[in-house]
Amino acid sequence: QTKPDANLGRSEQIFQVWLRPLRSNNDAHFATRTALFELDKLIKNGMTEKDFDATRNFLINFVPQMVASQNRQLGYALDSEFYNTDTFVKYVTSKLEKLTVADVNRVIKENLQTDDIQYVFITGDGKDMQKRLASEQTSPMVYNAEKPAELVAEDKVIANYKLAIPAKNIEVLAVDKVFE
């Protein structure tokens, strides 16, 4: 799902990072480390003006697509009524236009942290993934083509970036047991 549900009143927010399926447990381990590395950088350094502008421009152009069907228009109209706000597109676009990089960085500092982060991995070899995570096994990235030295150097740091997941907190579930 790439769009939030319409007509569903929210009382709290969730922050999630999703990683696409990868070739192997090593790649999944590396990608998870990369996500945490980048999240830690974002929390420490905030967002740059350039990244902020690019993201805000993307979102301003994306918001109208969220109400592309009559079904979603009705759902978001009900949401606007529930929250007592302007129509969805008008409300969100006006807020995005007024938003500043300082606002975003303040909210990042006040609200994002990785102390109680939770991970879910879906893999064909859960025991291997469990071992990798518990032992903080290195997860070097291997490319099919030559990459710039700067990227390779950063990848070496990321390959050993600590996820710090206590072994006692790592549980492997068989797929047929997940929804019991």
Which residues make up each language-model segment?
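M16 family metallopeptidases and their MPP-like homologs
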Residues: 1-101, 114-123, 130-137, 180
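Proteolytic maturation boundary segments
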Residues: 91-180
